[in-house]
A protein has these predicted regions:
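N-terminal secretory signal peptides
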Residues: 1-11, 21-23, 35
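Conserved C-terminal helix/tail region of periplasmic/extracytoplasmic solute-binding proteins
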Residues: 325-354
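Periplasmic-binding protein-like
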Residues: 143-144, 204-209, 246-272
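Early extracytoplasmic/lumenal segment of secretory-pathway proteins
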Residues: 38-102
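C-terminal segment of classical bacterial N-terminal signal peptides
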Residues: 27-33
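Mature extracytoplasmic/periplasmic domains
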Residues: 36, 271-329
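A ligand-binding cleft/hinge motif common to bilobed small-molecule-binding domains
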Residues: 106-110, 233-251
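Extracytoplasmic ligand-binding site segments that recognize negatively charged/polar headgroups
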Residues: 49-56, 79, 94-231
Length: 354
């Protein structure tokens, strides 16, 4: 069994434990806007920025709005949207039909009891969904992996593993991203011989790196600026973001670590009190259309989650993973991270950053 399969099966064992449709009117003078609502309204909670723009461009406009659905985006950061879902838990009718979340956050909302199981029978395109992206409580939209990133000129070589990245000998040539604390803790644990639920070896290693002079950047963007300025030469980041940085002229390369690459999945969940669940299934089905998946690969550098999407070989070489690397993708232990997140964040802030 691969690391990827073991992670998925383990997380699923933990999971097991634990219409306002408007009638069309062929009447002269009926506004186009009214006719466009003939299938009803779909409200999706999502991040803003490029992701929201590309949802409109690649999914909503060509595959939903053009077919009579009205789509409204409720844009906010995922902490705010998750808080809203929890606050609306007791309401018979919520305010959104879908929410875009990471795989970890999808699990957390499942654990909180605020989302429905996915009815895959109502999603025809799910037949092409990669098994690893078919969660009981959510559907994977796009994925990438937490790879080693480096500037060979600054570093004086190329890493092959997380162990090579989190080597105290790099001193201040190692860059760490503050908001990526969860994935950094797990990657460091793998580097130090720990596991996705044994992070203590990684915490010890990170303290050694800090003592040696590792730089901590507050955000992904600040990390990118540090790379651009050649302030440091090695770290970890999503491969998709690396492609975006390369496109922007930042001198950075990436490699899949030998321990197995930590997977990042962005997907959709359906709140239990979603007002229009038929719209929820329609949106997810459109999201899995090959055309939409292919455009997200081009526009954002993320990998498709369906097997019938076609990505050009040159693009796939930049954003994708080999069959062996896909087989070795490693999931966070969602139950462990949910249970220990508060303590891990406190350690990160007080011990590593303090």
């Amino acid at each position: 069994m691969s690391k990827r399969e073991a992670g998925i099966r383990a997380s699923r064992r933990q999971v097991l434990r634990g219409t306002a449709a408007v009638a069309g009117a062929a009447v002269f003078g009926v506004p186009k806007y009214a006719r466009a609502q003939s299938k009803g309204k779909i409200v999706i909670g999502t991040w803003g920025g490029d992701y929201a723009r590309l949802l409109t461009k690649n999914i909503e406009q060509p595959l939903l709005i053009s077919k009579g659905w009205e789509v409204v985006q409720d844009q906010a950061g995922d902490p705010q949207r998750r808080s809203k879902m929890l606050a609306e838990k007791r309401l018979p009718r919520g305010t959104t039909d879908l929410q875009g979340l990471s795989a970890l956050n999808m699990y957390q909302m499942h654990d909180a009891g605020v989302i429905d199981p996915i009815d895959y029978a109502k999603i025809p395109n799910a037949k092409n969904l990669m098994p690893s992206m078919k969660y009981p409580y959510g559907v994977g939209h796009i994925y990438s992996g937490k790879v080693a990133v480096f500037n060979e000129k600054v570093l004086g070589g190329a890493p092959k593993s997380y162990k090579d990245v989190f080597d105290p000998k790099h001193g201040n040539k190692l860059g760490i991203i503050d908001i990526q604390y969860q994935y950094t803790l797990v990657a460091a644990a793998l580097a130090a011989g720990g596991s996705t639920k044994n992070l203590a070896p990684g915490q010890k290693l990170l303290l050694e790196c800090k003592k040696a002079g590792a730089r901590i950047y507050p955000t992904n963007e600040a990390f990118a600026q540090g790379l651009k300025a050649e302030e440091f030469g090695v770290g970890i980041m999503w491969k998709a973001r690396v492609v975006q940085w390369q496109n922007a002229g930042i001198p950075v390369e990436s490699i899949a670590p030998t321990e197995g690459t930590l997977a990042y999945v962005s997907g959709l969940v359906v709140p239990k009190n979603a007002p229009n669940k038929e719209g929820s299934w329609a949106y997810i089905d459109a999201m899995l259309e090959p055309s939409a998946q292919e455009l997200f690969a081009i526009d954002m550098g993320y990998n498709p989650t369906v097997t019938n999407a076609k990505v050009a070989p040159d693009l796939n070489k930049r954003i994708g993973f080999t069959p062996a690397e896909i087989e070795s993708l490693v999931d966070l232990d969602y139950a462990y991270m949910t249970e220990n997140d508060e303590a891990l964040k406190e350690w990160w802030d007080k011990e590593l950053k303090g």
